Amino acid sequence: MLLLSGCSKVTKENYDKIKSGMSYEETVELLGKPEGCSETLGISNCEWKNDDAKIVITFISNQVTITVAEGLK
């Protein structure tokens, strides 16, 4: 039961806290470590998932520039 008490950080509440210009480190503090990231020419796309919920964030120069969410509760 203790494992179930650790709620996912992939929530609408946390998504709403993500602001343009936040650093990658600040974002990881808020959402936890991403499922994965891909990088091309200094642009990173990172993805956080939980069940049907997903947050994708694009970082340029280590700063949030674009955020997309699906299925958040």
Question: Can you annotate each of these PLM segments?
Answer:
Residues 1-6:
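Sec-dependent bacterial lipoprotein signal peptides
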